[in-house]
Swiss-Prot record:
Keyword Transcription regulation: yes
Coiled-coil ranges per UniProt: none
Task performed by this protein: Transcription activator. Binds the promoter core sequence 5'-GGNCC-3'.
Source lineage: Eukaryota, Viridiplantae, Streptophyta, Embryophyta, Tracheophyta
Region feature (Disordered): 116-136, 273-297
Keyword Chaperone: no
Name recorded for this polypeptide: Transcription factor PCF8
Domain TCP positions: 46-104
InterPro entries in the cross-refs: TF_TCP_subgr, Transcription_factor_TCP
């Protein structure tokens, strides 16, 4: 605040409010510093487009709405002054009415200045982080309300990563099955087998592979809602070992410990399952019958 004498009376007014008016006015630098300290920026990065100013009644917007007659009279004055900016016309009006302004009662300018006014504005790179616009607020709220768990992850992760994770156990299972049968063949089946093998015909295995590829293709191009019916993917059976089993059993028949073997769909449909025969005191062996030869007899 600064004290001025108007009409023999001492009055107080904001420091540097009227530069160059009256006898004891402050310098232009002091007035500029005083005005700058009263700016409360609502947007960062040096943008004062939506900034407010500190007044004796709190923060106020710099934008002023005028009535229709006042706006017409004001723009007429601006046109007569020949200035392009409305603020230039306002400054001319304040200087012209300096005597009348000094006669007004003084203001209580003991208000506290904002803490951010004395600090330099942040760089323009931080605009997206500290902006208080409605768009940024809605974006921050949407990010804050987003789920944090990995179970409901992004659509791309659900589409690709889960499919990849589901295919790894299947590949490991297929490799383990092939290794097991290879080890069993090298041992020449010394111990009696006590398990049941369900082999799948080649044409059925091929149709299931086609169905699997079609399911994966539909899952990749579908939406998240449509993929709900396709998830989780159905378990895939191990690869067909039917030709391998036929060749192995034809070379060395295996002993059966009470359970018959069921083999379906031979090559060309010629081979079929046959009941076990009892020989040598109840010993059962697997025998492959040729029904064509049997029909001839």
């Amino acid at each position: 605040m600064e004290e001025v004498v108007v009409g023999g009376k001492e009055r107080k007014r904001p420091r540097g409010a009227l530069v160059g008016v009256g006898g004891g006015g402050a310098s232009a630098a002091t007035a500029a510093a005083w005005r700058t300290s009263r700016v409360a920026r609502a947007a960062a990065g040096g943008k004062d487009r939506h900034s407010k100013v500190v007044t004796s009644r709190g923060l106020r917007d710099r934008r002023v709405r005028l009535s229709v007659p006042t706006a017409i009279a004001f723009y007429d004055i601006q046109d007569r002054l020949g200035v392009d900016q409305p603020s230039k016309a306002i400054e001319w009006l304040i200087r012209a009415a300096a005597a009348a302004i000094d006669a007004l009662p003084s203001l209580d300018c003991s208000f506290a200045l904002p803490a951010a006014a004395s600090s330099p504005p942040p760089p323009a790179a931080d605009d997206a982080e500290v902006s208080t616009s409605e768009t940024s607020k809605s974006s921050v709220l949407s990010l804050a309300n987003a789920p944090c768990d990995n179970g409901g992850g992004a659509f791309a992760e659900l589409l690709h990563c889960s499919n990849t994770n589901g295919s790894k156990p299947l590949q490991q299972q297929q490799q383990a099955t092939l290794a097991y049968y290879a080890a069993a063949q090298s041992a020449h089946m010394a111990a009696p087998m006590s398990f049941e093998v369900m082999a799948m015909p080649p044409h059925l295995a091929f149709s299931q592979e086609q169905q699997q590829h079609a399911t994966v293709a539909a899952f990749d191009r579908g939406t998240l809602q449509s993929n709900a019916s396709l998830w989780p993917p159905p378990p895939q059976p191990p690869p067909s070992q039917h030709p391998f089993l036929l060749q192995r059993f034809a070379a060395a028949p295996a002993e059966v410990a009470g359970l018959p073997f069921f083999l379906a769909g031979g090559v060309g449909g010629a081979a079929a399952a046959a009941p076990a025969a009892t020989t040598n005191g109840g010993e059962r062996r697997l025998q492959l019958w040729d029904f064509k030869e049997e029909r001839k007899t």
